[in-house]
Amino acid sequence: MAAVVGKLAPSFTCKALVDGELKDVSLSDYRGKYVILFFYPMDFTFVCPTEIIAFNDRADEFHQRGCQLLACSTDSGYCHLAWNNVSRKEGGVQGMRIPMLADTNHKISRDYGVLIEDQGIALRGLFIIDDKGVLRQITINDLPVGRSVDEALRLLDAFQFTDKHGEVCPANWQPGSKTFKPSAGDLKSFMSS
C-alpha cells in the first residue's frame, strides 16, 4: 500500500524504543490522535540528532494538540537503544520521549515512499496522519537538509483547524489568522480585506 494524501495511511507494526524499552508498536495504537511520523536516515549521524532532539524537546506542544510524534529509521531497536544511551554532547539523543521505530525490514519506509533502495536508508519524510488514520500531508527532504518543528506545528494546527471549523487556511496562515469558507464569495471577501 502506497502513501497517498487523502487515503488511509499505510498501517504498520514494528519494534520500537519507547521510554527506554523495546516494545511492539502499531500505527493503530494511536487511532483517535493525530500522528506525525517522521523518517530519518540513520542513528549516529549528523543532521539526524539535531532534528530528533528538536522534535523531542517540543514534544509537549504536539501532545497538547492531541498528536503523537513517531521517529523512524531502518536501524534496529538495539541501535536506537545504544544511541539513546549516548549523551547529547557526544552526538547522542539521550532522554528521548518520542518512540523510535525500528524499520529493519524496510517495509514502512518503502510503503511511505522514502526508502533509498540501494542504500537501505530513508529520506527525511514527514507525514501528518489525522485522528481517523487518513494521511493529510507529505513532505520529503533530501538527506542534507533538516526539517522545521515550527512548520510541522503550523501544519498540524492548520489541519486541525480546518477539520474543526470547515474553513480553509490561506498561504502563510498562522493560528489566529483569518480563514474563510471555501466559496467564491468568501474568497473575494478575504482577498479584498
Curated annotation (Swiss-Prot):
The keyword Heme does not apply. The active site is at 48 (cysteine sulfenic acid (-soh) intermediate). Its EC number is 1.11.1.24. GO terms for molecular function: thioredoxin peroxidase activity. Residues 3-161 form the Thioredoxin domain. Gene3D superfamilies: Glutaredoxin. It catalyses: a hydroperoxide + [thioredoxin]-dithiol = an alcohol + [thioredoxin]-disulfide + H2O. Keywords: Antioxidant, Disulfide bond, Oxidoreductase, Peroxidase, Redox-active center. InterPro entries: AhpC/TSA (IPR000866), Peroxiredoxin (IPR050217), Peroxiredoxin_AhpC-typ (IPR024706), Peroxiredoxin_C (IPR019479), Thioredoxin-like_sf (IPR036249), Thioredoxin_domain (IPR013766). Belongs to the peroxiredoxin family. AhpC/Prx1 subfamily. The active site is a conserved redox-active cysteine residue, the peroxidatic cysteine (C(P)), which makes the nucleophilic attack on the peroxide substrate. The peroxide oxidizes the C(P)-SH to cysteine sulfenic acid (C(P)-SOH), which then reacts with another cysteine residue, the resolving cysteine (C(R)), to form a disulfide bridge. The disulfide is subsequently reduced by an appropriate electron donor to complete the catalytic cycle. In this typical 2-Cys peroxiredoxin, C(R) is provided by the other dimeric subunit to form an intersubunit disulfide. This is Thioredoxin peroxidase.
